[in-house]
A protein has these predicted regions:
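Hydrophobic transmembrane alpha-helices that form the core helical bundles
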Residues: 30-34, 42, 51-128, 133-136, ...
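Membrane-interface helix termini and inter-helical loops of multi-pass transporters
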Residues: 27-34, 104-115, 168-178, 243-252
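TM-loop-TM module centered on a large, flexible mid-protein loop between adjacent transmembrane helices
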Residues: 72-75, 79, 110-112, 220-283, ...
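Membrane-interface "cap" regions at the ends of multi-pass membrane proteins
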Residues: 1-38, 50-51, 55, 67, ...
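Hydrophobic, membrane-embedded alpha-helices of multi-pass small-molecule transporters
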Residues: 6-25, 127, 164, 176-240, ...
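Membrane-interface loop-to-helix entry segments
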Residues: 119-167, 178-181, 219-223
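Juxtamembrane helix-boundary/capping and inter-helix hinge elements in multi-pass membrane proteins
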Residues: 34-37, 63-67, 76-82, 206-215, ...
Length: 317
């Protein structure tokens, strides 16, 4: 058993860290291009869908009273082969997800720092290695860092949103084409990936203090926090650069909005938020997927090396 159990703040940070992990940076322009002035509504709809999924996941986890998420649900239902395949697909997906987060971290930080062409790749590798080392130090260490990172990045994004909303003009939210209801729905579908991450909590169930109570109430807080910051950013960023620029700038739209707000300090702050977002997502994904791998290995569906723990009580592989 791990030496440190996760309280409300740590569980909230893992979920929010997994969700606000770069999605808002890459999807905002796509959502505005589809939904126009109704982009915030798309984020709300996406959040409601995520909450429905998260509520079901939490309720099933509490009812089963065991970790593992969809893997354990399928296994307990007798679909062992499907559960095994699902576990392998999930774990492979989390490895690729961490690689994407690390690539984004390297791209953002390398762009600001300049330097040789290999620097972004080196920074990406360093981010992965640093988070692996942190997770090997135990749940308490990883959770404490996750809380600090998530609070910092949300504060930066909230500050950017406040600056933009102080200049609010509804006319600036419009795009050339009228999006209509279909555009709002397409926008909501495209932002659902920005809410991906809440499912990590099902793998951490055994690590939680008073796990039934905590798992039963964490989803609205975590998903609601992500949805709130997404909606505020969706309303604020067009006030600073205009919808056309947000659409054309793609994943650097928020960085450009930060520069429009505060010049170079704003650019650096938003770049820091992007870097922290990817790092927190790497940390949350490594922390939770290692526990999924341990659960699968305990059932004999992965090599026993994945079930081993180090002296800190953390999965060591």
């Amino acid at each position: 058993m791990e030496k440190d159990k996760l309280g409300f703040a740590a569980v909230w940070a893992i979920a929010v860290g997994g969700m606000v992990g770069g999605g808002i940076f890459s999807t905002l322009g796509v959502v505005i291009a589809n939904a126009g002035q109704w982009a915030a509504v798309s984020f709300v709809l996406g959040g409601l869908i995520a909450y429905a999924s998260g509520h079901s996941l939490a309720a099933l986890t509490v009812a089963k009273n065991e970790p593992g998420g969809i893997y354990s649900f399928l296994r307990d239902a007798g679909a062992t082969t499907t559960a095994r395949i699902c576990a392998w697909v999930l774990l492979l997906g989390y490895v690729l997800t961490c690689a994407v987060y690390a690539f984004t971290f390297g791209a953002y930080t390398g762009n600001v720092l300049g330097g040789p062409a290999w620097l972004p790749q080196a920074l990406a590798s360093a981010a992965i290695l640093a988070m692996v080392a942190l997770n090997l130090r135990g749940a308490g260490q990883a959770a404490g860092v996750e809380i600090a990172i998530v609070v910092t990045k949300l504060a930066i994004l909230a500050g950017l949103a406040a600056f933009g909303l102080s200049q609010f003009d509804g006319a600036k939210l419009a795009i050339d084409a009228s999006p209509g209801l279909l555009g709002v729905i397409v926008g909501a579908a495209s932002v659902f990936m920005a809410y991906e991450g809440f499912e990590l909590l099902a793998y951490d169930y055994d690590e939680m203090k008073d796990r039934k109570h905590l798992m039963g109430r964490i989803m609205p807080w975590a998903i609601g926090s992500a949805a709130l910051i997404y909606v505020l950013v969706a309303l604020a960023v067009p006030m600073l650069t205009g919808t056309k620029a947000v659409i054309e700038d793609g994943e650097i739209a928020l960085a450009n909005a930060g520069q429009a707000a505060l010049g170079m300090p704003g650019l650096l702050l938003v770049t820091l938020a992007a870097a922290l977002s990817t790092v927190s997502a790497i940390n949350a994904t490594l922390f939770s997927s290692a526990r999924l791998a341990r659960e699968v290995a305990d059932d004999g569906d992965l090599p026993q090396a994945f079930a081993k723990r180090n002296e800190a009580g953390s999965p060591s592989l």
